[in-house]
Each structure stands twice: as C-alpha cells, then as structure tokens.
From Swiss-Prot:
Designated name of the protein: FMN-dependent NADH:quinone oxidoreductase
UniProt-listed Enzyme Commission number(s): 1.6.5.-, 1.7.1.17
Pfam families: Flavodoxin_2
InterPro entries noted in UniProt: Flavodoxin_fold (IPR003680), Flavoprotein-like_sf (IPR029039), FMN-dep_NADH:Q_OxRdtase_AzoR1 (IPR050104), NADH:quinone_OxRdtase_FMN_depd (IPR023048)
The reaction(s) this protein catalyses: 2 a quinone + NADH + H(+) = 2 a 1,4-benzosemiquinone + NAD(+); N,N-dimethyl-1,4-phenylenediamine + anthranilate + 2 NAD(+) = 2-(4-dimethylaminophenyl)diazenylbenzoate + 2 NADH + 2 H(+)
Protein species of origin: Staphylococcus aureus (strain NCTC 8325 / PS 47)
HAMAP family: Azoreductase_type1
Lineage, top ranks: Bacteria, Bacillati, Bacillota, Bacilli, Bacillales
Amino acid sequence: MAKVLYITAHPFNELVSNSMAAGKAFIETYQQQHPDDEVKHIDLFETYIPVIDKDVLTGWGKMSNGETLTDDEQMKVSRLSDILEEFLSADKYVFVTPMWNLSFPPVVKAYIDAISIAGKTFKYSAEGPQGLLTDKKVLHIQSRGGYYTEGPAADFEMGDRYLRTIMTFLGVPSYETIIIEGHNAEPHKTEEIKATSINNAEKLATTF
C-alpha cells in the first residue's frame, strides 16, 4: 500500500481552475485503480506553513546548541518539522499549481522550503549534495494561459522547471507532468484543452 500526498496550490476549485479539474480527475481515477492506497489532500492555501524567518533560523540554531526556544520559535520550528515528517512518510506526490508570473503561487515555495532540509531530504558529501528521496515519485499538474512548453516564451517558464530541479536535487527518480496551456492565448479552444487534460490525467492515474 502506497501513501500519496495530493498537494494543491490554487485558491479556487475544479469548477474554476483547469489544473484543479485535471487534478480531481487524476485523484478520482487513481483511487479507483489503487483502492488500497492512502491519499491525503494538502491544500496549501488552507495550511499554515511558517516561512523561514528570524524565529525559525534562531530556533534551529538554539536546538543545535541545546538552548531553550521562545514560544514563537518553538511553534514555528515544530510546525515545520511536522510538515517535513508528513512529506517523508509518503511514497508519491501530486502537485497541482497554476502558473503565476511565470512560476507558481508563493505557498508552493514555502512548502518546498519546509521539506528541503539537509540530513532529511538531502545530504552533503565530499562529492557534493546528494538527494535522499530515491524511492519517491512526483507528478506536477500545471495550468498556463499561454504557451510555455515550446516557442519564444519557453525560456521564461520557471515553475515546473524549478519544481523538477528541486525534486531532482532531492533525489526523486521519477518526475512526470501534465501541462495544460493555451486557453487564454486561444480562448476558442478552452473546452478542448480542458477535456484533453482531464483525459491525460485519467490515463496517467492508472500507471502512476
């Protein structure tokens, strides 16, 4: 039995968002095809994720030295630890994001910062950093209004590229994508684009 974290980063649901519609189709099909697997939904817009600030950095330093943390430091450090441990407990991750300003919503970066921890998801060695998530799988579903997979705007895309890079850095050997794009560039194709993405999501769910 595998554990899947379904990690969404959109303020709207599948009735408004193409990425959320594809994500919903994926998860529903996945659960039908893998009834024994556990799926947990993490809505990053409804989840408290402390940013790495002065309290967190000071708290980590105090922990290393065996010193007492303030209440704020302890609260933030403990919450980040809980997020990390939940992430480590899973076998597969499904990220659902929109493209915002060539990347993704800031809550995704906050989440990535929470799970990118030396000694837990990667380690330092004489040969350089080494990823520790060598038995995990990732799927990224992202919706973009324009075309960024290829063409003149391809070099501007930094959301999926960053997520793929950080997951590779953390050692993840399997990274797949469902990219939904062009519905703003060609509004007359909106329904066709959405239907294709849902179909692709349902197909991938059977083998993921």
